[in-house]
A protein has these predicted regions:
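Repeat-solenoid scaffold signature
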Residues: 21, 29-32, 36-48
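N-terminal single-pass transmembrane signal-anchor helix
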Residues: 1-31
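Short amphipathic beta-strand and strand-loop transition segments with alternating hydrophobic
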Residues: 104-115
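Short, glycine/small-hydrophobic-rich surface segments
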Residues: 40-45, 50-97
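Acidic, glycine-anchored loop motifs typical of Ca2+
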Residues: 127-134
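Low-complexity, S/T/G/P-rich flexible repeat/linker segments used as non-globular hinges
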Residues: 134-161
Length: 161
C-alpha cells in the first residue's frame, strides 16, 4: 500500500470536513427536534382526550379538575423515570395520560367548569440544557353549552431555551 501524496491527503481532509460540516448540524437539529416532539405530542394527546370527554358530558363537568405540574420538579438537562404512582392523580387517569419511559418535560392541566362555559389549558415545561430557563408549551380548549368543544392553536415560548 502506497502513502498518500500531499494533494491526495488535502483532498481527503477537505472532503471529510465538508461531510462533517453538513452532517453534524443536521444530526443536532434532528436530536433537538426529537426532544420537541415530547411536549407537542403530549399536549396533543391531552387536548384530544379532554375534547372527547367534553363532547360527551354536561358543560359544568366537561373537563377534569386541575392538577399541578407532574412531576412536581421540572427535569433539568436529563431524562427522568417517574416512580410508581406519579401519574395516579384522578385527572391524569381521566385523560389516560402518563409516561412509562424516561422523559424531559413536566405537564399540568388547568380547568374551569361552569354551567354555560368551561375551559382548560394543558401545559408542558422543560429545561433541556439545565440552565434554569424553561421552554413552555400550552394548548387551550373550551366548550359552550349546546356547542361543540373548540381548541386553540398551541402556544410555544422559548422553544429552544
Amino acid at each position: 500500500m502506497r502513502a498518500l501524496t500531499p494533494l491526495e491527503l488535502a483532498v481527503a481532509v477537505s472532503l471529510g470536513g465538508t461531510v462533517a460540516a453538513t452532517m453534524v448540524p443536521t444530526f443536532l437539529r434532528n436530536v433537538h427536534a426529537s426532544r420537541l416532539s415530547e411536549p407537542v405530542d403530549g399536549l396533543k394527546r391531552i387536548a384530544a382526550r379532554a375534547t372527547l370527554r367534553a363532547s360527551g358530558l354536561p358543560t359544568e363537568s366537561a373537563y377534569p379538575e386541575s392538577v399541578a405540574f407532574t412531576p412536581a420538579v421540572t427535569p433539568r438537562a436529563e431524562l427522568v423515570l417517574d416512580p410508581p404512582g406519579t401519574w395516579d392523580a384522578p385527572t391524569w387517569r381521566a385523560l389516560d395520560f402518563s409516561f412509562d419511559a424516561p422523559h424531559a418535560y413536566a405537564f399540568a392541566f388547568e380547568s374551569s367548569n361552569s354551567e354555560g362555559h368551561s375551559t382548560f389549558t394543558a401545559r408542558a415545561r422543560g429545561d433541556l440544557d439545565g440552565d434554569g430557563v424553561t421552554s413552555s408549551f400550552a394548548i387551550s380548549g373550551s366548550i359552550e353549552r349546546g356547542a361543540e368543544p373548540k381548541l386553540q392553536p398551541m402556544e410555544i415560548y422559548r422553544e429552544v431555551e
